[in-house]
Amino acid sequence: MCTTTDVVVLSSSPDQIRSCSLANPKCGAEKAFVLSPVSSSPSSLPSSSDLFQPPTRSRFFKPGGGNEGSSRTAREESETGTKQNDLAASRKKAAVRGGRQKRTKEQPPNESQTLFDNPEPPIPKHNGCTSKKGTGSRKKRIDAASKCTKSGSKKITGKVTKPGITETTKFENKTKIVTSDVSPGKSPANKLELEKDGLQIEVAMKRRLDWTPTKDTGKQAVALDDTGDNKTRFGELLSEYGFLKAAAVSQTDSKLSDGAPTKCRRLELVDTHNPSTSKRTSPDADSDRSNVRSTRSSRAPAAEGKSKKRSRKITTLTGRVTALYTKDCTDHLDAANTMIRASEDVSSKLLSKSLDLDSCVLAPGDAVDYLQDQDLIFGTCSQLEREDSPTMLRDMQKEICASKNSMIENRKPSSTTRAGSGLYSHTTVSRFQTQRDLWSVAARDMDGSLAEIEVLDMVDITDVSELPPKPNGELPDRSEKNDEDTVSQGESSRPIEITDDFGVEVDVRMEYLATSETKPEETAYAASEIRPMPRFADWKDSDLSRQVRLYGFKPMKNRRKMIEVLERCWKAQHSSTRTGVQYAPGKPDDGSTGKAGTIGSQMNKQSSKMDAAEKMRRESACLKEKAKSSTALEDKLSHATDRSSQMLTKSSFAHMEEIEDSEDEVIPSPSQLQSLYKRHISESRSSHPLPVSDTPSTPSSRTRTNADSDTKPSPSDSATESSLPDLASQITKAVRLQPRSFSVDCKRPSWHEKILMYDPIILEDFATWLNIEGLGLVHEDREVSAEFVRQWCESNGICCGFRKNSRRSER
């Protein structure tokens, strides 16, 4: 009869590595009895008193009579018996919970029950089927089992579970699996059961849904839009880009009605397919907005009355400035607005809002007045900040407006004249049909071709009758002009045109009177036509010195003395004829002098008829002499122009007034210096003026016209050439003409080299060199002082200074 036992063996020996496998198919009944599969059910824990007892003793062990050499098997069996009793107690508790009777009915009475009933250690009974070999192997397995139980006593192993989780049904099933029927006759069946059962590991629990959400693998149906209209929409793309006037009108109205152009407002979408249906066209939307605004204003406290007005009238700097320009742009939209509005109430509201905008621009008064006075021109700082004049911008705007108006006026007749030509027909479509702007109209005539306009330089022209010089540099024919002057003097009907600037003309006449050997009657007649005494104080030093030299005096350094001498000479010369003709003192002649015949009539009234006849004869003689001298002067002028042109072509040196750093490389060669000497000698020897001067004239000595009937050369040429050159220009020439130092070490550089090297110039030394050697290079007899040299240096930006031991302070 097969018996099944459940044995738990505790060992107190040290831990050893188990070399046997649990699932061994060749094990016998004894091995199967010892190596039962480990139960997965929780085992009952031993009590605290059992744990603290010695591991080799138990409460059921009775010490022997001192024979310690007894077999160890009996001791091991006694220990296993105690453990089996504990296991039986736990089994009884499990049987109380349920299912103990069922299990006993199904299972036959086995050896485990007898062990549980008897507290004594059981003695194994060997059947006849067992052999000696089997007993030997059983002893070995028992020893291994006892070692395992002893090593297990050191470590408390178990599984703690909550009482509510485990169920009785599961416990019964597990206990059934743990208890295996061991019979020597059915070993192959036991082998199959061990292979099927395996290690009896508990099945892993299913993962909780709270930790990781499960992936929804189900297919979801996606509702797709109907794309049938896309084919038609693609063809209508270009139509949507068109300009819709109604939509633009509604947008401009919303901007003007809501307030300033820069106010942050809600975006309003406009239906492009139906442009007529917009929020501005619906009166209900406007009424709703007005109601919302009224409710907001009613909720505000009464103390904020002033702030309400300010919030209603949005006044910003940008709004005020741009409102001046947006007024004109929105005037042409009023008619379109009236067509779109649905009711009179909405139109009245919009009108009130536009009035509020206008009043908003005008308030507060001072700020708006200040803004209106300003002229706004948009540009960069460098473009706007050109001049400091406050009226510059306003004048510029006036000129721009005037030019625009003139363009508009010019377009009207041009359109009428071009209508007949048929070039610009409004029926054809062309990009050249638009109106032209200022850039296209400039320098073109009415027919559209380039206009060849002659440009006249009116800066130096002081008389209307004077002809401008020809572009190729040729001078007007003076012989023809002189002939016309003589004819005009002979005729009593033609008036004589006289310029306002008469100082140089007086000088020329005085020179002519002083040089020409005429009779005292002729000089008296010529002096009668002389104008009042010129203002010598306005003349330059060169003109004064020239005039003094004409009277026979030596050049003077003092300006006041020269002026006094000239005034006395002029009074002494014109004292005899001054009583004949009366002039307005201090006022220049305005060109309203009488004719030659009127002057003769005045002289006839003061003198006898005989004197008048003699004067007429003298006049005719003077005219003949003037005609002869004019022809001679023209011949000399032609020769002088030829010589000057030849000199200019031969010499490539350009005479410069200013001293620059780059002039150290442009030093004249000896041949150029020789040509300059020859030119200066020819200028000084020639009593007649040269028409073209290679040296620039000073700003004060401008060209003047010869309006009288004199046969002398023009006053402008005589003033620039016959007069002595300026001392400043002479100093510049002398500095440049000084020979260059050719020494190796350059211990004594020239004055020009010192100036170029920014060396300080000692004024006393420089003035001494000019008076002794420098001015002699340019044939100048005058002398200069250190103070005059200082002024010349400062005007040219040259570093200069006096000596330290001098009384003057060092510069």
Swiss-Prot record:
The keyword DNA damage applies. Residues 107-116, 599-609, 712-723 have a biased composition (Polar residues). One of its GO terms (biological process) is DNA recombination. It is found in: Nucleus. Phosphorylated in response to DNA damage. Residues 36-161, 266-312, 464-498, 579-649, 680-726 are annotated as: Disordered. Residues 281-291, 611-642 have a biased composition (Basic and acidic residues). Keywords: DNA damage, DNA recombination, DNA repair, Nucleus, Phosphoprotein. It comes from the Eukaryota. Residues 36-49, 689-704 have a biased composition (Low complexity). GO terms for molecular function: 5'-flap endonuclease activity. GO terms for cellular component: Slx1-Slx4 complex. Residues 90-103 have a biased composition (Basic residues). Forms a heterodimer with slx1. Belongs to the SLX4 family. Regulatory subunit of the slx1-slx4 structure-specific endonuclease that resolves DNA secondary structures generated during DNA repair and recombination. Has endonuclease activity towards branched DNA substrates, introducing single-strand cuts in duplex DNA close to junctions with ss-DNA. This is Structure-specific endonuclease subunit slx4. It comes from Aspergillus fumigatus (strain CBS 144.89 / FGSC A1163 / CEA10). The lineage of its organism: Eukaryota, Fungi, Dikarya, Ascomycota, Pezizomycotina. The gene is slx4.
